[in-house]
Amino acid sequence: CGIKFTSDEPSALPELSERYESSVPGLYVVGALAGYPLIKLAMNQGYEVVETISGNEIPPADEPLLEEKFAALPGRKVNDLLREIQENVPLLSHMSALQFREFMIDSVIHLKKAGDVIFERNEYTNSVFSIVEGRVNVQINPEDENEVVELKKGSFFGEMGLIAGRRRTATVVAKRECFLVETPRRAMLKLISSVPGAKKVLDTAAIYRQIQTHLAPNIEKELLKEIVDSATIESLSAGDKLISEGDESDLSLIHI
């Protein structure tokens, strides 16, 4: 019927507006087919669709949840904040309006002051942080807290816990006042499995950071582009053969 989906994956959801309208004008999708299997959610969505078709302006059912989520930012409308976050953070820009509203309900808003510790090295946490406003310092040397990498607006951090399931590899401190979005691992995994553009942004950033950390700490990011574009992230199980004695190869491998 011409409905577009977010990816070619069998589990991909249809692209929908915040009013559940598909890419086919006038065709709406609610409930399990839209990624919401609970009957109560489907009923709320159906009500919104009927009111929309009737020409009545009503707030989305999730509006109170998002208003509560953004309570620390008084005087700013939900839609304006959602738009600002997606515009400022490339990782989050590939979601549809409906996907992003659900994503933000699962996430937590943090407002940090300069000097606040966001998380510490070796913590057993695996959420991902996105920087909507402000800057943070990543302390990459446990022996010298002044050896840092600065991350600016639009960046994200904490992805190694997501990709490799490891403890935090660095301490991160707010350099100035920050507006951060913290997203749990489950929501991030759902994002990268259903939105190919987000997975590409995440993988590319992870490769850049691993190369800069382990191979080329003093080389500008732009000079590494050709190397990063040719690199891939591979997952191996116990017992899988990585290389064999006598292999002829010009590859470099980084264990993350």
Predicted features and spans:
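Cytosolic regulatory regions built on CNB/CRP/Popeye-like sensor folds
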Residues: V50-I256
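Short secondary-structure boundary/hinge segments and terminal tails
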Residues: E15-L16, G46, L191
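Short secondary-structure transition/capping segments
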Residues: E18-Y20, L41, S193
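Short, glycine/charged-enriched secondary-structure capping and boundary segments
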Residues: C1-I3, M43-N44, P196-G197
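Gly/Ser/Thr-rich helix-start
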Residues: I3, L27, A32, Y36, ...
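Conserved mid-domain beta->alpha element of the FAD-binding
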Residues: P37-E51
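FAD-site-proximal beta/loop scaffold in flavoenzymes
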Residues: C1-P37
